[in-house]
Structure formats: structure tokens, C-alpha cells
Amino acid sequence: TEEAADQTLNQAEVIEDGSKIYVPTKEEVKAYINRMLKSMSKAGNRKPVFYNVSHNGYVAEAYYETTVQGTTYQWYPIGLVSGQTQQGNFLPYVDRYDISFADKVKGFDKKARMIYEFDPADIMYSYMYPAMVRTFRTAGFQWITQFSYDPMDIAYANTEYQTHFLNLAYTPHKAISMKIASEAAQSLKRGASYGSYPQDTLFGEGFRVSYTEDLSELNNGNKFYYSNTTRTQPKDAS
């Protein structure tokens, strides 16, 4: 009815072109998630369910009042689809990963935390991946997934989604950086803090990142990985 339509528009948000979009309430979001969970359970799902909470922070409480087992986030600290190769030192951009409602929402620490996609997009440098993973671990993330898909036929440029560019064939230095980042994800303690840039370019057991050297490095006595030329000597050369 016209009256119902007016009530709906009262719960709407005006966007730039003057049109309106419906903005759900906290209770509606909670009910929607619970209906999905019920449907998945009836379909036989027995695996943990994660829900993306990195948007619509005004209803963040609703996410944590459901029975989802985990929450998901993403990070593109220098943007996406710039149309050009970005230049510069982006390490200060990844000093912190702040979750605005972390200390405001009841039950925040009772749900697992996952990064469902991340990438320092539009760069050719090899120093960023371990730094981002370091910050994710400081923020308490348990699962970290990098966004990239480069079929071999288009891997030279990734024309399908050119803002992402990571593969062993054409960006071996970045691939090694990602390998080092994987080591960091598995060894760095959740919640551990490593200070601010530039102090946090050295972290954990043998990890180092450098903008001036375009370098990711792991040198812990058992493993010596480096993404670019380095003057570092192996901790244990035997």
C-alpha cells in the first residue's frame, strides 16, 4: 500500500542520485542471518559458518547475536583498480588493522576471525605481503586468504582482473614474498604487537621487510628466504 511504502522509505537512505535504498534494522539483519543458518542446517551443513561483518557497522551487534561461528573481513590498504602501477613506500599504510566495534560489541572475542581477501593491489613490489600478515596476526586473525587468480594463458598481465598480479611465472619475487608471508601467518602469535613503522619492519623470529630494498626476508636459522637481492648472511649457514 501507499502507506506501507511511505513507512519503508522512512527507513531508507538517500544516495547521490536522489533515489533511496532500504536500510534494514538490527533485528531484521539478525533474523535474516538466523534464517540462512536454519536453512543451511536443514540442508545438512555441519561445517562452521562465517559472515562478512566488515560492512554496515551500524548493525554490528546483530552479527554477534547470531550463532555464526566466525566473522570475515577484507583489506585493500592502497585501493583497487588504479589503472596504473602504484609507486612508493606503503608500509606505513599497514601499521594497523582497526576494527571500529571491537571493544563495543558483546561477544566479539567469542567468534573466529577470517580475512576472506586482501591484496596490496596495483604494485610490483615484493615487500608488502609479510607486513600485512603481521598486522593481521596482531589484530587476532586466524585465517588469511590472499585474493588472486592468474590462469597461465593470461598470467603475464592478468587481464581478467588486472589490479591483482601475483604468480610464480611472471612475478616470482612477489610469489616468494607470499611464501614468506605464509610462514609469518603460521608462526606469529595472535595479538602480538611489533610497534609502529619503521620499528615493525623487523618482527617475529627472523622476519624483515624493506621498502628501500624492495625486500621480504625470513632468516631464522632453519629457513633463509628472500624476495630480492640481499646482503643478509644466513643465520646458520651450515
Where are these regions (language model features)?
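Extracytoplasmic/secreted proteins, especially bacterial periplasmic and envelope-associated proteins
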Residues: 24, 28-35, 131, 176, ...
